[in-house]
A protein has these predicted regions:
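Acidic, surface-exposed loops and disordered segments
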Residues: 1-201
Length: 201
């Protein structure tokens, strides 16, 4: 499948075949591709993934997730989180193999960009999570899987349920598996002229 086909065929699947399973090794391969090839600001790779396989944990998440069936019925459920402090805790590790001069420049730039700027820190993890989510869903589509990005849930209760570390934030959930039934018709999209402006507003 080429990229444009994956983009056109991907839909937010609401109903999954609960009997369909994805072997753990295939889950791992899918995630490894997304982890390896998704871009992120300063290559900080802000994302942290919680893959929820346990049936009881899925049921608990569904209770605080507006009772959405994707949470329990999909073959793979990921709570996509991000480390707010990664700019400080991991930057030297991430850039350690770079040319020393480049490494020093990048580490200094990261520090200047993020330090004492909580809004920037949060904005960046959400941007990176969005890039990761779309990459993962397109890779899943290429493998013949359906997916659904989800944010209809109680973030505070999900955080309690998964024992979220204090320096992490929940970005969204992603359900992956085999859809069943026909998807709803696509809703209309904004016109090109309404969505796109050249040079200035």
């Amino acid at each position: 499948m080429n990229v444009i086909d994956a983009v056109k065929n991907r839909r937010a699947t609401k109903q999954f075949d609960a009997d369909f399973k994805i072997p753990r090794e295939e889950k791992k391969a899918l995630l490894e591709d997304a982890l390896q090839y998704t871009p992120s600001a300063f290559n900080l790779q802000h994302w942290r993934l919680l893959v929820v396989d346990d049936v009881k944990q899925r049921q608990a998440l569904r209770k605080v997730g507006w009772d959405q069936p994707q949470i329990t019925d999909s073959a793979m459920l990921i709570v996509l989180c991000a480390d707010i402090n990664v700019w400080e805790s991991e930057v030297k590790t991430i850039w350690q193999d770079a040319n020393p001069e480049v490494r020093d420049i990048m580490c200094s730039a990261v520090d200047s960009y993020y330090r004492n700027k909580p809004q920037v820190q949060r904005d960046e993890i959400m941007r990176s999570a969005g890039l990761f989510a779309q990459t993962l869903m397109l890779l899943a589509q290429e493998r013949g899987f359906d997916s659904c990005p989800m944010d209809g849930f109680d973030f505070a209760e999900v955080a309690k349920t998964i024992n979220l570390p204090d320096h992490y934030a929940i970005c969204l959930m992603i359900a992956i598996g085999k859809g069943k039934g026909k998807p709803f018709p696509r809703l209309g999209k904004l016109s090109f002229d309404k969505a796109v402006t050249f040079d200035h507003f």
